């Protein structure tokens, strides 16, 4: 597959995920105890054996660089690379103006790789996709551009590009983030929306980006400018994500946009559901990341409190002593002392929680210390005085906070 180049857009600021993105770019936000959001996009390429990948970064990218250096460094393998590319500012002293501009400013890297096809994917969604199957569809249709898509409730579709297709899968309509999205014919409750994943013929991509860059009135965005210009020509096709088969998986079509605190929290709760729609345990589709050299988690009773853990994920290096933890995910090196109760919470790691605490429906970022006796998540009005609380009542403790000291 030497003719395929992956371009992962990883420059998202993630303002709706604050305070988790106050000190890191959105793709570097931890997820699922052991991972970062970027890992899922990278694994989709690696598991498809596409190993020429550029990761385009922009805002607050240092933690992303460190993670990729430790977990995704394949430099030295002939003709294979996973390279982060910082904003080059080749077109002047400015950030990327849009998704298309981000690729345009890095056309020199595309030319250097000499691909036949360019796969442009986002990096802040939770899903599994065998990109090779989408590429095969693209080739079979002799498309110039293929867009992956899925069904979305009509009430949520306004946040996405809404697509219309004919019986052959050819795109015949597209509107980016419409106020009144069109439903799927025969399915009035749902719309067909773009996942923001594209496969281009290399020559088509370069031509369209050059033309778009010359337009002063363009927003230089794939959804707003490139796709609306291309689809009327009849060479843009739509790949149905639900037809993508992952070996070893019984569920198909799971895709979560974790761009808000509520969605991020809910995606973690999905991992803990009885019949989890997204599995971290499929040996036929391994999820690579950087695993620090840590001992197994230690879980034991204290002198006056028995440990009680149910429906949880506990990451390596954690030390749980006499605590009661339910329906929660604990990242690397989480230390919880006796008589503390934690439920429906996500702890991102390197966190110390003292004795006799009560924590419910919270997201606790890295390097947080919580003093003994602290109560979080039981009194919304009090929580709002001291912490960030989402509209849905999820308490978020920012990175490095010292609570109760």
Curated annotation (Swiss-Prot):
<dbReference type="InterPro" id="IPR029044">
    <property type="entry name" value="Nucleotide-diphossugar_trans"/>
</dbReference>
<keyword id="KW-0321">Glycogen metabolism</keyword>
<feature type="binding site">
    <location>
        <position position="96"/>
    </location>
    <ligand>
        <name>alpha-D-glucose 1-phosphate</name>
    </ligand>
</feature>
<keyword id="KW-0808">Transferase</keyword>
<dbReference type="GO" id="GO:0005978">
    <property type="term" value="P:glycogen biosynthetic process"/>
</dbReference>
<dbReference type="InterPro" id="IPR011831">
    <property type="entry name" value="ADP-Glc_PPase"/>
</dbReference>
<dbReference type="Pfam" id="PF00483">
    <property type="entry name" value="NTP_transferase"/>
</dbReference>
<keyword id="KW-0067">ATP-binding</keyword>
<keyword id="KW-0548">Nucleotidyltransferase</keyword>
<dbReference type="InterPro" id="IPR005835">
    <property type="entry name" value="NTP_transferase_dom"/>
</dbReference>
<comment type="subunit">
    <text>Homotetramer.</text>
</comment>
<dbReference type="GO" id="GO:0008878">
    <property type="term" value="F:glucose-1-phosphate adenylyltransferase activity"/>
</dbReference>
<dbReference type="InterPro" id="IPR056818">
    <property type="entry name" value="GlmU/GlgC-like_hexapep"/>
</dbReference>
<dbReference type="InterPro" id="IPR023049">
    <property type="entry name" value="GlgC_bac"/>
</dbReference>
<keyword id="KW-0119">Carbohydrate metabolism</keyword>
<dbReference type="GO" id="GO:0005524">
    <property type="term" value="F:ATP binding"/>
</dbReference>
<dbReference type="Pfam" id="PF24894">
    <property type="entry name" value="Hexapep_GlmU"/>
</dbReference>
<feature type="binding site">
    <location>
        <position position="194"/>
    </location>
    <ligand>
        <name>alpha-D-glucose 1-phosphate</name>
    </ligand>
</feature>
<keyword id="KW-0547">Nucleotide-binding</keyword>
<dbReference type="InterPro" id="IPR005836">
    <property type="entry name" value="ADP_Glu_pyroP_CS"/>
</dbReference>
<feature type="binding site">
    <location>
        <begin position="176"/>
        <end position="177"/>
    </location>
    <ligand>
        <name>alpha-D-glucose 1-phosphate</name>
    </ligand>
</feature>
<keyword id="KW-0320">Glycogen biosynthesis</keyword>
<protein>
    <recommendedName>
        <fullName>Glucose-1-phosphate adenylyltransferase</fullName>
        <ecNumber>2.7.7.27</ecNumber>
    </recommendedName>
</protein>
<dbReference type="InterPro" id="IPR011004">
    <property type="entry name" value="Trimer_LpxA-like_sf"/>
</dbReference>
<feature type="binding site">
    <location>
        <position position="161"/>
    </location>
    <ligand>
        <name>alpha-D-glucose 1-phosphate</name>
    </ligand>
</feature>
<comment type="pathway">
    <text>Glycan biosynthesis; glycogen biosynthesis.</text>
</comment>
<comment type="similarity">
    <text>Belongs to the bacterial/plant glucose-1-phosphate adenylyltransferase family.</text>
</comment>
<comment type="function">
    <text>Involved in the biosynthesis of ADP-glucose, a building block required for the elongation reactions to produce glycogen. Catalyzes the reaction between ATP and alpha-D-glucose 1-phosphate (G1P) to produce pyrophosphate and ADP-Glc.</text>
</comment>
């Amino acid at each position: 597959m030497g003719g395929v180049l992956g371009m992962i857009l990883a420059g998202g600021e993630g303002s709706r995920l604050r305070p988790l993105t106050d000190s890191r770019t959105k793709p570097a936000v931890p997820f699922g105890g052991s991972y970062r959001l970027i890992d899922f996009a990278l694994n989709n390429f690696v598991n498809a054996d596409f190993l020429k990948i550029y990761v385009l970064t922009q805002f607050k990218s240092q933690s992303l660089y460190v993670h990729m250096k430790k977990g995704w460094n394949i430099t030295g393998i002939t003709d294979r690379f996973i390279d982060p590319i910082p904003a080059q500012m080749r077109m002047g002293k400015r950030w990327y103006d849009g998704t298309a501009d981000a690729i345009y400013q890095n056309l020199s890297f595309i030319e250097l790789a000499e691909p036949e096809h360019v796969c442009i994917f986002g990096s802040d969604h939770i899903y599994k996709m065998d990109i090779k199957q989408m590429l095969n569809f693209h080739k079979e249709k002799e498309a110039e551009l293929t867009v992956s898509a899925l069904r979305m409730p009509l009430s949520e579709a306004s946040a996405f590009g809404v697509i219309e297709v004919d019986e052959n899968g050819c795109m015949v309509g597209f509107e980016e983030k419409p106020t009144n999205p069109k439903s799927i014919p025969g399915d009035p409750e749902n719309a067909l929306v773009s996942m923001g994943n594209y496969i281009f013929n290399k020559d088509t991509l370069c031509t369209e980006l050059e033309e778009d860059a010359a337009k002063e009135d363009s927003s230089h965005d794939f959804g707003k400018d490139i796709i609306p210009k291309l689809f009327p020509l009849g060479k843009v096709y739509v790949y149905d994500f639900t037809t993508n088969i992952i070996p070893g998986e019984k569920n198909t079509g799971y895709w979560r946009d974790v761009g808000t605190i509520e969605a991020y929290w809910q995606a973690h709760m999905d991992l803990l559901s009885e019949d989890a729609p997204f599995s971290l345990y499929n040996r036929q589709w391994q999820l690579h990341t950087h695993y620090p050299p840590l001992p197994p988690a230690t879980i034991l009773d204290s002198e006056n409190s028995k440990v009680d853990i149910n429906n949880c994920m506990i990451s390596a290096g954690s030390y749980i002593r006499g605590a009661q933890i339910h329906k929660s995910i604990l990242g690397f090196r989480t230390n919880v002392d006796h008589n503390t109760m934690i439920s429906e919470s996500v702890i991102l790691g390197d966190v110390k929680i003292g004795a006799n605490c009560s924590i419910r429906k919270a997201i606790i970022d890295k390097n947080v210390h919580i003093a003994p006796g602290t109560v979080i998540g039981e009194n919304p009005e009090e929580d709002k005085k001291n912490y960030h609380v989402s509209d849905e009542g999820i308490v978020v403790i920012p990175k490095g906070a010292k609570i109760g000291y």
